[in-house]
């Protein structure tokens, strides 16, 4: 069977430079991240600002309204300050996920270092803006209102642990779902190839895994959107903590 993990290997394309003894390389992951950025930029430029929206403009406007409504619902009107960040994260993750479904491409969100970097960006934004806007009142985030004094110390410890584990849970959710989905697709596609090589009987038997592969591909398209949405809405919820730490 073809190795289902091989699709996630990082391959160096060329060396950019060195920091000390550490090589800085341009990899296939870097290339597909740049591709996602180029596709997003191209879509935005192609959209235009026509009074009667075309295909690209309709997609961009729909994406804009979707993210804006999600942010307003989760973080209120003040949350729109972070719209550029949230919209960029949603589009980058969604486009990267969609590109990764195409055969022989690379799924950047299937690498924990990529998803953790995005989650860490959100985490640091929450901390920096939280202290900038609220000062020491930001610590209210760790002291929920209405908690009996007897168990308050325990609750505070739990809240602190929960807060600092956010980058891990935020990143692992996206990484694990994309990794598992692509491994499953690769396994069923391998069954199709193996059975197809066994002659007529094998080709007939390959119809079942082929059908499952097609169905799983459709499911992965939905997962590509859902995982981008989940990452985005969690980002909005975390940003709301920076804006309203006492709520």
Swiss-Prot record:
The root-end lineage is: Bacteria, Pseudomonadati, Pseudomonadota, Alphaproteobacteria, Hyphomicrobiales
The primary site where this protein sits is: membrane
Tell me which family the UniProt entry assigns to this protein.
Belongs to the ATPase A chain family.
Q: Its function?
A: Key component of the proton channel; it plays a direct role in the translocation of protons across the membrane.
Which key words tag this protein in UniProt? ATP synthesis, Cell inner membrane, Cell membrane, CF(0), Hydrogen ion transport, Ion transport, Membrane, Transmembrane, Transmembrane helix, Transport
Q: What topology in the membrane does the UniProt record assign? A: Multi-pass membrane protein
Q: Tell me what organism the protein belongs to.
A: Bradyrhizobium sp. (strain BTAi1 / ATCC BAA-1182)
Compartments where located: Cell inner membrane
Protein name according to UniProt: ATP synthase subunit a 1
């Amino acid at each position: 069977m073809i190795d289902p993990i091989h699709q996630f290997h990082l391959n160096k394309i060329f060396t950019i430079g060195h920091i000390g003894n550490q090589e800085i390389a341009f990899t296939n992951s870097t290339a597909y991240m740049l591709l996602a950025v180029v596709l997003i930029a191209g879509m935005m430029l192609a959209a235009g600002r026509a009074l009667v929206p075309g295909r690209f403009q309709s997609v961009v406007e729909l994406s804009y309204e979707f993210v804006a409504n999600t942010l307003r619902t989760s973080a209120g009107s003040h949350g729109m300050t972070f719209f550029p960040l949230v919209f960029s994260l949603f589009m980058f993750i969604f486009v990267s996920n969609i590109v990764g479904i195409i055969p022989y491409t690379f799924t950047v969100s299937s690498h924990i270092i990529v998803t953790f970097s995005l989650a860490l960006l959100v985490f640091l934004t929450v901390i920096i803006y939280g202290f900038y806007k609220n000062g020491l009142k930001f610590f209210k985030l760790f002291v929920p209102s209405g908690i009996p004094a007897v168990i308050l110390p325990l609750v505070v410890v739990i809240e602190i642990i929960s807060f600092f584990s956010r980058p891990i849970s935020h990143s692992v959710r996206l990484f694990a779902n994309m990794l598992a989905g692509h491994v499953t697709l690769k396994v069923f596609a391998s069954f199709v190839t193996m059975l197809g090589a066994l002659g007529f009987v094998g080709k007939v038997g390959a119809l079942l895994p082929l059908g499952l592969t097609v169905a799983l591909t459709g499911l992965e398209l939905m997962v590509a959107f859902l995982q981008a949405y989940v990452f985005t809405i969690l980002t909005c919820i975390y940003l709301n903590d920076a804006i309203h730490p006492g709520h």
